[in-house]
Regions:
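A generic local structural motif
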Residues: 71-75, 105-107, 201-204
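Extracellular/periplasmic catalytic domains that process cell-envelope and extracellular macromolecules
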Residues: 80, 113-115, 130, 208-211
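C-terminal cap of thioredoxin/glutaredoxin-like
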Residues: 2-57, 65, 91, 173-251
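Structural alpha/beta surface segment adjacent to cysteine/selenocysteine redox centers
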Residues: 90-93, 98-175
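Residue-level signature of catalytic and energy-coupling elements of molecular machines
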Residues: 86, 94, 184
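A short beta-strand-turn-helix
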Residues: 65-84, 249-250
Length: 251
């Protein structure tokens, strides 16, 4: 009787090589997912806030409410005693916010801020942990450099906002502004500062109904369409007039 021919087995060396490749790939994948998991976990720190924001939309505030005036220590673009007040709620990781600052703010500055028709009060509304840490970085910068930090962070947003190594990228940017790694680490670890930023976001969400960025209020009235710079001027003409209140830190 003739036995059927057996299939030729793969060489042992080849099998070992395949196993090693699979192990290496698995290890690399585990490392990737571990990093991604860490980032996801960090970003959930603000997820609860987002849920709180959309669960209840408050009734519109009176335009004269103190929330729509510049507060001491806030960053103000333009002349602090300008008659009109534009409030901007912004997230440092928000691409639309970056676009506003690069493409629309210069025109707004020329038409309204430099002429004294209005001032722009910049407020933080971080949407995720990278934005929160970038906000802390701005607040830890010297007062006279905060506007420049915001400008650079928006210009370099693609470098850090969507990176798993966003803290390292932020440290690189901070170094250009004179903050060393130890100062940045201390800034990120400042729980009081973090709580103050998150509290400001909660106030905007629960009292003014802010649920996206950027959001703008012109003399206390929400500007729904800010797709063009001249919409701000038109809103100023129709919005309630408010007495000038020279507060905040002028840029």
């Amino acid at each position: 009787m003739t036995l059927p021919a057996s299939k030729k087995s793969a060489p042992l060396g080849k099998i070992i090589l395949i196993v090693l490749v699979l192990v290496a790939a698995a290890a690399g994948g585990m490392g990737y997912f571990s990093q991604k998991s860490n980032l996801d976990e960090a970003q959930t720190q603000t997820a609860a806030l987002s849920q709180q924001t959309v669960e209840k939309v408050p009734a519109p505030l009176d335009p004269s409410d103190a929330l729509f005036t510049a507060q001491p220590g806030e960053l103000v673009f333009g002349k602090p005693d300008a008659a009109g007040t534009i409030i901007e709620y912004s997230s440092m990781s928000c691409p639309h916010c970056a676009f506003f600052h690069s493409d629309m703010l210069p025109q707004l500055k020329k038409d309204l801020l430099d002429t004294g028709k209005a001032k722009l009060v910049f407020r933080y509304f971080p949407l995720n942990e990278p934005a929160l840490r970038a906000t802390q970085l701005v607040e830890c910068a010297p007062a006279e450099k905060r506007a420049q930090f915001i400008k650079v962070l928006f210009e370099l947003q693609k470098n850090w906002a969507f990176s798993e190594r966003f803290k390292d990228e932020l440290k690189t940017i901070a170094a250009q502004g004179g903050l060393d790694a130890a100062q940045v680490d201390s800034c990120f670890a400042d729980k009081q500062l973090e709580d103050r930023i998150i509290e400001g976001r909660q106030v905007a969400a629960t009292r003014a109904g802010v649920n996206s960025t950027p959001s703008f209020f012109v003399n206390g009235v929400k500007l729904e369409d800010f797709s063009k710079a001249d919409h701000f001027a038109k809103a100023l003409e129709s919005a309630p007039k408010k007495p000038a209140q020279p507060t905040g830190d002028a840029e």
